[in-house]
Amino acid sequence: MSLPEAYQLEIQALNKQVLQTCPSDILQFCADFFNSRLATERAASISLFRDRGTPSPRFPPSPTNPHFGMMSSQFSSPFGANANPFGGSSSNPNPFGGSASPMSSSVMHRVVEEDESDNHLAPGGSLFSGAFGGDASTEAPPTLRAPPTTDSYPAQYNFSRRTSVSAESLKPSADGFDNWTPPYTDKTPEQVERLKYAIEGNFLFSHLDDEQSAQILGALVEKPIPARGIKVISQGDAGDYFYVVERGSFDVYVNDCGFIEPGPDGLGNKVGTIQAGGSFGELALMYNAPRAATIISAEGSCTLWALDRVTFRRILMESTFARRRMYENFLEEVPILSSLTPYERSKISDALETQKFAPGDVIIHEGDPGHSFYLLESGEAAAFKGEEQVLSYKKGDFFGELALLNDAPRAASVIATSDVKVATLGKNAFQRLLGPVEGLLRRTRYLGVKTGVEEMDPLHTQ
């Protein structure tokens, strides 16, 4: 049994388009091709009936969608929400109300002409035998079909088949699947001091600890500016670098329109000059916002140090993720918090604040009200009742956890015996995150809430 000639012609036309276009998504391409052919044929049929002054025929639903009906060429295709991934836009409106056909307008025009002059029956041609052959007036007028309403379509009729998303990849390496290390550029001690001075007053760096600051300073890359008049950043461009001026000066220009215009005055008005030790472009470390000004070197032999947004955020993320894991491990060892779920421990870890103490500094005073709980991140400390040392603390130890239960005065003082860094959490912050501690204690029937609790913490009043 041979295939119908009309079918062979359609397949040949499809093969020709595939060879010319080489689409990456063959199913989408074929669907667009046949939908376009169907729309072209039916649009031509409707136009023919309109020219003859006869009512348009009632087309049957598409075999691929029972809700698919047409009265004109302007209807909504299930692919209408997508841009055509196989070619540019066509000058002719797409009868599917969305993406352009994979065929160019000239190909579409040629297909229409071929259809009009072709003696072979196209797919669905038998449906119009009464209209195309003989006297249409001798037959009963075809039944008209009202345009379909949006309620008749499936809920996701125009749902996008595919969506592309692009973003910067920021995955912590502490999970063990990435060996990323921060970039590092050698600098002299004098350069490090100048750079540290330049960033210490910037709000983006004010919350960094010593380790993060050292990584940020090490990641700065030198950018020599050899001549005067070199444009470092342009107003309106997307920002992705933060700059610190080590040597030289840079003029700042702002155009009220928000971008550089052609002409001698296109830079706008000069609003200031950035000298050595200054910085600019810090907003680029948070998001790629358009530059608010144009920066141009005001002299030759200038030196800049640059830091890109991805490195900055990756350094913060790596250190923050590692510190959170450390805090969570510490919190697992606190008896009063043993009933917390991993999610609750994670919330507390994010709320902990870091404090530093030099050797000999008093962390808490005997007799003071207890408002905070402490985790020892690094260093060593000792607890004293009067002049007598009663306990010593090392990395990972904790003290003052009963401050989460009540505000009883401290029973002892804790003094740093070396450089100490502690993570602290107040009772108010704890209750704001997880509610009253008493509820957590009830979950594990924590013994000692009313009796024997003083044995849990040497800093509790005897």
From Swiss-Prot:
| Molecular functions (GO terms) | cAMP binding; cAMP-dependent protein kinase inhibitor activity; protein kinase A catalytic subunit binding
Q: Specify which residues bind 3',5'-cyclic AMP 2 according to the UniProt entry for this protein.
A: 336-453
CDD domains for this protein: CAP_ED (cd00038), DD_R_ScPKA-like (cd12098)
Name a GO CC annotation attached to this entry.
Answer: nucleus
- What species is this protein from? Hypocrea atroviridis
Q: Where is this region: Disordered?
A: 79-157
Q: Which SMART domains match?
A: cNMP, RIIa
Q: Which domain of life is it from?
A: Eukaryota
Which keywords label this protein?
cAMP, cAMP-binding, Nucleotide-binding, Phosphoprotein, Repeat
- Family (UniProt): Belongs to the cAMP-dependent kinase regulatory chain family.
Q: How is this protein named in the record?
A: cAMP-dependent protein kinase regulatory subunit
How is the quaternary structure described?
A: Tetramer, composed of 2 regulatory (R) and 2 catalytic (C) subunits. In the presence of cAMP it dissociates into 2 active monomeric C subunits and an R dimer.
Gene3D superfamilies, per database record = Jelly Rolls
Q: Where is the composition biased (Low complexity)?
A: 80-102
Pfam families to which the protein is assigned, alphabetical: cNMP_binding, RIIa
Identify residues that carry Phosphoserine.
164
Q: Give binding positions for 3',5'-cyclic AMP 1.
A: 204-333
Where are the stretches annotated Dimerization and phosphorylation? Answer: 54-203
